[in-house]
Amino acid sequence: MREAVSITGQGIICAIGNDLPSVLDSLVHARSGIRPMKYLNSRHSELPVGEVQLSNSQMKRILGLEESTLASRTSLMGAIAIKEALAQVGKSRLEGKRVVLISGTTVGGMDLSENYWERMKNEDSLLNLPLCNDCGNSTVEMARMAGLEGVRCCTISTACSSALNSVMLGAEMLRHDEADIVIAGGSEALSRFHLNGFNSLMILDKEPCRPFDETRAGLNLGEGAAFVVLEKDAGSRTLSYVTGYGNRCDAFHQTATSENGDGAFLAMKDALEMAGIAPGDIDYVNAHATGTPNNDLTESRALMRVFGDNLPEISGTKGLTGHTTSASGSI
């Protein structure tokens, strides 16, 4: 087993809560955040989504920002989750340390880009396209709004694996002495671009999604952010350890997993081997469980390949939060 990495802080915001205690309470009581659109303006208003129940203006006030501050919803949610995670650690611990922020996002500031495109058409000018729409700059803006001036920033865009890839990269940086503290996770906001893309794949359910159910008909898109603070073995301050992980790409199809879940199977196998444990040591699996016919079937097959007849408890949370895509791994 390789050197363990400690998780010492956690922060989250999503459709079922604006912080860790409220999210946990919603999970325990199975309160769903899937509801009609409130903040997203879309022609597909019949589709339920998992929206964070705060406007951009409310999030700016939480962060102590002026209303005029130009910030994407992705950056605002990310900054709120980061600040919660840092509050648990104590910001003074960052002083004099090599701190890195790694965020996973694929949509970035698309919520702003969509609105500015309309202005560009009307005003015949490119000057209205703000830099903060870029995925990479979303991470820089999160750092600034969370009071992390001067930290190194990195952005990962690997769709639904983005946030967990951020955690994996952070753990590797610590193990190779490239950083002292890493804040890793992901943030993703709903946007028309986002919704339309998934709708074109015909995998969005008009009812609350039902992962692993025989009658499942698709997913509900969601939004949110979650970040963890990673440190080299932190002793008694450790909330949990990152002991093993795996990353595979079977290159089967751009939007579908292979029939027998080869990528998921190999990634889980790698994670177990890195951690130095056997499948029988696992008590619970939080599955990707999107609610689509393809994902849930192939993921189930991958799990059965790993665990055989001794399946542990398995469940997913997207039926409550919606599929938060790039942020889903850390959420």
Language-model features and meaning:
Residues 41-42, 70-75, 129-136, 153-162, ...:
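Active-site nucleophile and cofactor-binding loops and adjacent substrate-binding regions
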Residues 97-103, 153-157, 182-187, 239-245, ...:
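Beta-strand segments within the central parallel beta-sheet cores of soluble alpha/beta enzyme folds
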Residues 102-154, 295-309:
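Active-site-proximal gating segment of KS-fold condensing enzymes and close homologs
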Residues 16, 21-103, 109-110, 267-279:
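Conserved active-site "lid/cap" helical segment
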Residues 79, 158-175, 219-222, 226-237, ...:
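Claisen-condensing/thiolase-fold acyl-transfer catalytic domains that form or cleave C-C bonds
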